[in-house]
Amino acid sequence: MERPSLIFILITFMVLSHVVTSFNKMSKKKARPELNMAHASLDDQYDGCMASMKRLLPSLFRSELNASTLYSEAWEKALFEWQENKTWLYPRKLEELSEVALYAYTLGYPPLYQEFNSATRTAAKGPEEYAAYPFKSLHFLLTWATRFLGKKFSCQRVYRGTGVNFSVGHYFRFGQFTSTSEDPEIAQFFQTVTYFKLVTCKGIGISEASYFQHEQEVLVPPYEMFKVTSVEKHPTNKTIMAVSVGTCSDHNCIFVGEVLKYTKRCQDHQVLYL
């Protein structure tokens, strides 16, 4: 009598485990990442401390390259690509360092952009997260690039296709440096579970400093804020139309220990498009 009872218990346990696992998988499928104001992201614009950051950059940059194989390998490959169009071997000023940073960010392999974006989305969650953030130098160089480098335009329509089913706030920021394209067909080439039609006023054209120059890439910074104007829902995807409404930062000059002096703080907005 004991053996059948044991078998029954084991079978019951296996069935329940399968049900729980299936439920968890279904829950994960239904979960929709929310695009909101991304308060935990590192949105530092370095207002008022550019000179200080420039002075501290060499030692910070060297220490981070030495600490990260991914970062150092991506930088080495990016430097090689950058040198192809130069008559000198190494960057001589901040502008040229930022150009190499853009090459490194846009590389398909090694995929620095994946780890960098993921870390940037939570790097300002708290002091411990910022201390552990391994890309402070890259963040500064890309921020400098989006503010002072690249093709300048007042505002421009760009497009982005993603394989993620986002829910979105009435106002949102991407919370990371975000690649978009001037060409809608290029953006549609990527997975388009959520397709963005954006008007950006802070993004910069980086085709000349991108590893994939044919993509007509425009880089949108994490501190640019967008207002959703409409959402078109389809059976398998959605299109989100949004326009730039300026910039805001919850954090400024963290590395040098300064406080918010110049930047606009970010407010919460609760209306959601599911």
Label the predicted regions.
Residues 168-255:
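ADP-ribosyltransferase catalytic core
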Residues 5, 28-33, 118, 211, ...:
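Intrinsically disordered, low-complexity segments enriched in glycine/proline and serine/threonine
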Residues 24-45:
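Short N-terminal segments immediately surrounding and downstream of signal-peptide cleavage
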Residues 249-274:
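Intrinsically disordered, low-complexity terminal/linker regions enriched in Pro/Ser/Gly
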Residues 1-4, 272-274:
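A positional/structural detector of protein chain ends, strongest at the extreme C-terminus
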